């Protein structure tokens, strides 16, 4: 089973490969391989979609880190994220760099949401 229901978007492939390695399986990399989604459409990258993307990338990263590397490692990553992105968020807010401000805010929000047990929205 490739899916972990706690990973809403992103990091599924990392989780899957780490589980295979844990089960003693070998991962083979084929850099020449190409994959194409059969019935895929792209939505325009609105501010809301960009927010959800950044949020889910960070939340999933923290979840997979704790799942495979333990609580201490995930706490270290949380501290690194907050120490890096809180000052950047404040700076980008002060100099009116909206796009960067919203990205950093999404990262901080996802990190805090993870700490307080809020899971990704699936709608």
Task: Label every model-predicted segment.
Residues 1-34:
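A short, conserved alpha-helix in the catalytic core of glycosyltransferases
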Residues 52-60, 71-123:
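Non-catalytic, C-terminal membrane-associated alpha-helical segments of glycosyltransferases
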Residues 40-43, 69, 91:
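A generic structural signal for secondary-structure junctions
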Residues 7-10, 47-54, 101:
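Flexible, glycine- and charge-enriched loops at secondary-structure boundaries
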Residues 23-48, 60-61:
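Active-site donor/metal-binding and catalytic loop motifs
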Residues 64-66:
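A bilobed periplasmic-binding-protein/Venus flytrap-type ligand-binding module shared by bacterial periplasmic
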Residues 18-21, 62, 112:
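Residues within alpha-helical segments
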């Amino acid at each position: 089973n490739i899916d972990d229901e706690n990973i809403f978007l992103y990091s599924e492939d990392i989780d899957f490969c780490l589980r295979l390695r844990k089960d003693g399986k070998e991962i083979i990399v084929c850099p020449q391989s190409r994959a194409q989604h059969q019935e895929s459409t792209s939505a325009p990258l609105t501010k809301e979609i960009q927010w959800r993307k950044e949020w889910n990338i960070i939340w999933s990263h923290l979840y997979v880190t704790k799942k495979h590397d333990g609580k201490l490692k995930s706490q270290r990553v949380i501290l690194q994220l907050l120490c890096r992105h809180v000052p950047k968020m404040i700076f980008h807010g002060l100099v009116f760099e909206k796009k960067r401000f919203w990205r950093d805010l999404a990262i901080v929000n996802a990190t805090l949401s993870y700490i307080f047990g809020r899971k990704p929205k699936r709608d």
